[in-house]
Swiss-Prot record:
Source organism: Arabidopsis thaliana
Protein name (Swiss-Prot/TrEMBL): Probable disease resistance protein At4g14610
Occurrences of domain NB-ARC (ranges): 114-418
UniProt keywords, alphabetically: ATP-binding, Coiled coil, Leucine-rich repeat, Nucleotide-binding, Plant defense, Repeat
Keyword flag DNA damage: no
Family that this chain belongs to: Belongs to the disease resistance NB-LRR family.
Repeat region (LRR), residues: 400-421, 422-444, 447-469
PANTHER family found in the cross-reference section: NB-ARC DOMAIN-CONTAINING PROTEIN (PTHR33463:SF220), NB-ARC DOMAIN-CONTAINING PROTEIN-RELATED (PTHR33463)
Amino acid sequence: MALTKLRFVNQFSQWLCVRKGYIHSLPENLAALQKAIEVLKTKHDDVKRRVDKEEFLGRRHRLSQVQVEIERLCFCGFCSKSFGKSYHYGKMVSVMLKEVENLSSRGVFDVVTEENLVAQVEEMPIQSTVVGQETMLERVWNTLMKDGFKIMGLYGMGGVGKTTLLTQINKKFSETDGGFDIVMWVVVSKTSEIYRIQEDIAKRLGLTGEEWDKKNENKRAVDIHNVLRRHKFVLLLDDIWEKVNLELVGVPYPSRENGSIVAFTTRSRDVCGRMGVDDPMQVSCLEPEDAWDLFQNKVGENTLKSHPDIPELAKQVAEKCRGLPLALNVIGETMACKSTVQEWRHAIDEEWKKTEVKMHDVVREMALWISSDLGKHKDQCIVRAGVGLHAVPEVKNWRAVRRMSLMKNELEKILGCPTCPQLTTLLLQKNHKLVNISGEFFRFMPNLVVLDLSWNSSLTGLPKKISEVETTNTSEFGVHEEFGEYAGVSKLLSLKTLRLQKSKKALDVNSAKELQLLEHIEVLTIDIFSKVEEESFKILTFPSMCNIRRIGIWKCGMKEIKVEMRTSSCFSSLSKVVIGQCDGLKELTWLLFAPNLTYLDARFAEQLEDIISEEKAASVTDENASIIIPFQKLECLSLSDLPKLKSIYWSPLSFPRLSELAVQEHCPKLKKLPLNSKSGTAGVELVVKYGENKWLEGVEWEDKATELRFLATCKSLYR
């Protein structure tokens, strides 16, 4: 019995000590609990900023319950004088302290963070330096960091460096702690589909999985919005072509309250306005010095020093890039391995400035690879242009060749008699040393469709046997200087393209009459002169050519060009005209009969006074001259070195499609332009471009409204 009582006393003492310990340790435990909960809250706050999945909300709710209990204990526990209540609170504090310590020690939040954490900024490949854009980058960044600035639009032409600039901004966010939780990059492009934009944003936020994939655009927008509204974010949208509705995507609109930022690039200033940007930033082409620095970096010092003439030629090539970074990069990289003067001159050489597209070697090689059925039929297409050939290259299988280009080489003689039953295209132009072509060379080319022998200044004659080629399919035939006789060109009845320009021995009037027999001619470039001085031979009469699409007239000694059929449809297909070095011509009124003309370039014509003469217009047409309104489809008008030019047209024209009216140089008497305040208002922005400030200052505008309309948008051709 005594033993039983002793055991009871011991157990009661232990029980009492435990309870006394709860009460005695209550202040200490409560302080420890408060400290532990602060640590736990710090972890909670850190994770809260980075975790986007809704499952995390349950843990936050549990933590908030713990916090409420602590506050209640702090308020009630110490105030109670009841042993029972003090014991009860003391025990609760001790238990909760262990729970909090257990939560922290188990690393619950670390696991969550590891599973849901996304990088603040997604790093992207980028150039180490941005030649010529440092100032622009600093300006954009400072504006973005300015308090209250929340949405930015960068606009500029394609290839000017907008994407590069935005990539640099993305990089600066990774290097600078601006307090942003996440930076998102989305490439939008022409197909600005809401669904695809949402997908790219969701990947950055960690919103993935089967459940997400099943949601429609509206539900996705809600999920994205619920995540982003709790965060300070940056959204970078690259290459947008139309307004992106942020609300439909689910992106909260940036404001001073949420501190978020949206920045985008576009080619259109109008898009900036539709996105709510009142003062967008224009990304312009590089200044000449910066452009030259970039081009030099791409070409490399070794190439520039490989020949004393190359630096000057390189500057000419760089100038043709007009400060466009994409062109400077691509062409600079292409020319980096060009160490001969010939290769650099080849890069500079141009024929039709407005109708040719430069193609660098990589793109050309890829195009040839594709055209040869991914390399399977590479023997069918032989391109050796501008590589310094002195003789026709050896070909293993002439029978397989369908297209061959040997243009711009050093060929002196073309000999042999290859059998080419499948050859359709042969380009031999611009071989300035070429003096002789064997008559047998063309003998076994029965399917030749395109033959270009133009710009061969040393070639003394056309092979006599070329007319013996058994073909009725020839559709393009070009010849050039000092071929002696052009008679017989009209026998090529299927001829579609004839190039005779820039000849030392130009086409005479009698030979020009044969042109009217070319019923299918579409492209014609010719030099014409008269052998006699009589005025009757100073007039060139064009036949009606309904199919012709392009005409280039060079070194024309005629004083006047007429047409046989004086109706508005006799040149109904003509779209492009170039007039150059035609010192006798005083007007080009015959263009009234080209209703579909889109491009007109007139240059180096010392006597040219009018493009369309009012006096001539009244006499040259069988129709009422007032009914024929010229240049309704004209898109580009370029004038240069026309010292006597006074008028383009005698009254203002609507120019519904004209986008560029360029007066380049040496047109001092052209004071009045055929423009009024309503010209070019049909949807296309009409811009007047000029080469000389003095000319622009002397323009006599139709009225004040016209001056205000066009003067503000005039652009220099050399800036």
